[in-house]
Structure formats: C-alpha cells, structure tokens
C-alpha cells in the first residue's frame, strides 16, 4: 500500500496546514501502518507532539485535523470516516473498493506493485569473500546468502548492483604456502589440476606450522612474498595456479546456491595502496607512531584513554588489511575509469569486524573519499551456533565445511520426502525425488538463516529448518504447491478482466496482506534486514491458508469464483517473487 500511504500522507499534511496555518512547529502526520487490524489500515500519530507547541490537548488537535479531512473529497474517496482513539491517535481505514482497485492493478504484473526507485544509483555489495587455499566453511554461509539476498532486493528496486567477492588472495600466507609446496610437492605448482582444494588446505596447515616453528622457513617465506610483490614470473605463476584451484572450488558452491559474484580480490588494490598514504598525507591525517604510519581515530580510545590508531603502513613498510580496505572504499566511490562511481557501498561481514570497519569508515570519511549523499554501510551478522548454543563445529571439533553442511541438508530432505511418500503411498521417479530434495534442502538452509535477525546469533537445527510447519522454507514452498494444485484441479489461475468482488473477512484480510508487499521490499532495501521479508512471507502464507481453509474456492458461487482464484494467483505470484528475492526457487509439486 505504498502509493496509498504516500497519497494519504500528503492529504494529512495539507489538512494539518489548513487546521493550523500559523503553527511554527513542524506539521508531520507521523503516518504508520496500524499496529492492529481493529485500528484500521493506518494510524496518524502527529497530534501528540503538537500538544506542547500549540498548547492544546492532543485530542482537540486530532479533531481539528479530522474536521479538515472531512471536507476533502479526495480523502473521502480514499478512506472511510476517520476515528480518533486514545489520547489523540487518528485511525484510518482505506475504502474496500480502493483496496480492490489497488489489487486489480497488480494482478498478473511482474513487479506486483513494487515501484522502481526514482533515484537509481550504482550500489556495491561486498559479500562472501573467502580466502584462497582455504575451504569455505559455515562461517561463509551467512555473508554469502545475506549479501545475495540484499543484492537481489536492490536489483529488483532498479539499482545497478555490483556484487563483489573480495577474496583473500594476497599476503604472507602465499609466500609461506608457495615455499612449502616448492620444497615438498613441486608438481602441485605445474598445473591447477595437480592438487585439489582439500589437499591444498592440508598443505596450508603444514606450511603454517613450519612458519611458526622454523625461523629459516619463515625467512624463506618472507623472501617469497618479496618475489611475489616484485612480479617474479615463477612466483606469480604459482600464485595464479593456487588462486585458480580455489576459485573453481568456490564456484561449485556458488553455482549450487545460485550465487552471482564478480571476483575482485585484495590483490586488485595493490597498485592503489601508495595513493592511500599520499591521500591521507595530503589532508594531514597521517601520523608516524613508533615507525608506523597511522591515523588516530576521533572519539575512540583505548583503556589508557588515548585515541586508538588505524595503522595504514607497518614499520617495515608493508601494508595491511586496513590499507587495502581504504583503497577499496576509495576506488568504489571514485569516478571511472579508476572507480565504480558507487553511491552506496555495503559490506556484509560478521559482527566481529564491526570495530575494524568503524575505524576504516571514519578514516575514509575524514579523508573526503565518501561523496556527499553517498552511503557507506557495514551489515554485521552473528554466529551460526549448534543446538548447544556454542559455535557450530563437527563432532571432532573442526569447523563445519559448507559443502558438507549442504550435502547433509539435501540428504535429510530426501529422507523426509521418501518417508512422506511411503506414508501417502505415493510413487515418484528418482529424478523427482532428487529435484525436490535438493530444492527443499538448500532452501531450508538459506531460509533458516535469512529468517533470523542478522544481528543475532542463531542455532542451526536441521530438524527445525526442514519442518513442514512453522516459519520454514518447506512451509512456504508448500503454500505455493497448494495453490498450484488448484490449477491441477481445474481452477483457472489466469488473469481475468472481471471486476474483483470480495465479501468475506478472510478475503479482505488476504487482500490487505498482499498489498503490504511493496512497503516490505522498500523497508528491506533501506534497512538491509532480509528477515523482514521472511516474516512477511510467513504471515502471508498463514493468512492465505486461513482463507483457503475457511472459504470455498473451487466450489465457490459463480460470482465469487474468479475473485477468489485471483487472490490465489496473486498470493502464489507474491510468494514466488519474495522467495526469489531470498534466492529460493519454488516447486509445483512436493
């Protein structure tokens, strides 16, 4: 009901201006969706903050506003008579015929009432970002699917979105790994197919142990880093092969999860690192402290009360993550050809990096690298925990590999499906079982994560996420399947030109819920909280199921049939669209 609320907001502002033409206070109707159905569709709470400046009781102010609204023909065509409640709230109910018109305008459309944003702007979403020579684990799950969902919503709103994978493809670890492989398995550096990622991870662990225990190996590794940074062809070839092998393994997981990303690793920004120092020097932010080049933060102090530094060049002349992140921010906001010209840059990482990004963002802001009106945002998320409330681990105490987690989700989904088929005495092909199990299993993993407020930790449970009841992917997928079954039973779900007619309260409840979709999408775009969309889709499914269980559809009277089928069609379209924005495909049968 976004367009209706915007119209209503303008009408309320005009009424307030007419009621209080001499008011010096800001006249804001404070229009919001009604908190309960009995309060109507919207509530205007703007009378309360005017009580003090106008020196009038809020109910008296509300009455004056309502008196002005009563003479507004356009308002009367949109709303029923407003009601004043409590200390001065104005409850507003949209006329049923306007709700039906609004729904009719959305039927069969691709956008389902969601407007394209007026100010289209380039957006960068930085997410996933695994490290080369390491396998993706459960910790990468949240960044990958939260970032993908946010990118999908921003794209749906009309923004040009650059989905960046800031992979860890540079640093001391490569000197360490290349040195180790040259010494113990030189054949692995001949071709990218000579070693798989699992072996590479094992080699990395061996190299790390040698680096920590052996001073000579450590020195040789540092020399290898210098060669790599200097462009030594042998070192660069070895580095490229390691990156290619990891990249192929990452892509298998991205394909499986239907994730699109443009890789732009840390190494991309190497040529831009000296300019970071030059830029900070130019605005007198750079300070030498104990041989290192730093920027001291404003308003952030350590235990000793002194300002904390962001180190951008170590005392040995090397750069670090902060330098790379500053170079990335500068590039992403800069104009082409040496930048992305973004107006909004979003980083999706775990909450443990909040202080790091707060510091880096402050430095970039003070350096003048963030254009006026542009947005630079960190989207933090909590940990994935086991059912014991501790960080999710394997029984052996290792980090859970993402590949293994997805495999188990699909396996459990298939077990549940085969059990259900046996109970229902249904026979399905192996291809059907495989397709449904894969779709439901992966959807369950995604939805279980996205349905949680990303700011909190959440407990991972296969049993809960695969349940057919509750706020789960299977429950939502089944709602779509249920509607698809109407067509199989002879219901025409095609778009009809017949006027929509509703009489039952369950119908109107569903109409109102369907019309909330546009507002929810705009909220997710602004607040970057995918769980808002999940909550809406779950509520929509519940409202639809109550409608379908309590009101006849296929056996409806002729005058009601087409309108009820239209409700079913639009519910399915909304669920499919909403789930697609979460990266979840739907099914026709389960």
UniProtKB/Swiss-Prot annotation:
A motif ('HIGH' region) lies at residues 130-140. One of its GO terms (biological process) is arginyl-tRNA aminoacylation. Keywords: Aminoacyl-tRNA synthetase, ATP-binding, Cytoplasm, Ligase, Nucleotide-binding, Protein biosynthesis. The keyword Ligase applies. It catalyses: tRNA(Arg) + L-arginine + ATP = L-arginyl-tRNA(Arg) + AMP + diphosphate. It comes from the Bacteria. It is found in: Cytoplasm. One of its GO terms (cellular component) is cytoplasm. PANTHER family: ARGININE--TRNA LIGASE, CYTOPLASMIC, ARGINYL-TRNA SYNTHETASE. This is Arginine--tRNA ligase. The gene is argS.
